[in-house]
């Protein structure tokens, strides 16, 4: 998260109640993972959301699927456009190589 640190917001508990009560429908890129002993987020998944409730809506969809039982926290970067979120997501997947992202698909 070093390059985007000033824009990065997090870490928040990856929990249905937390996300449901989060009053934000902004689009952007989100990071799901666990907080390491050094306080940084170890990223397991990077995703983008720009419609249908933005990041909040996409996180609620992931939570309803209940597929990442080891994910405990999330963070995000708000983006001004869908193109910006697509570019950031792609670059972050390449940079972070998260275990739940399928490499080569963005």
Stretches found by the model and what they are:
Residues 68-73:
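Short glycine-/polar-rich loops that comprise or flank the Walker A/P-loop
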């Amino acid at each position: 998260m070093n390059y985007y640190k000033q824009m990065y917001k997090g870490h928040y508990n990856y929990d249905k109640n937390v996300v449901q009560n989060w009053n934000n429908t902004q689009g952007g890129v989100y990071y799901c993972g666990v907080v390491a002993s050094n306080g940084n987020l170890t990223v397991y998944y990077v995703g983008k959301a720009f419609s249908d409730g933005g990041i909040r809506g996409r996180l609620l969809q992931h939570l309803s699927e209940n597929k990442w039982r080891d994910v405990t926290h999330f963070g995000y970067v708000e983006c001004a456009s869908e193109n910006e979120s697509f570019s950031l997501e792609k670059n972050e997947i390449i940079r972070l190589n998260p275990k739940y992202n399928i490499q080569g698909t963005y």
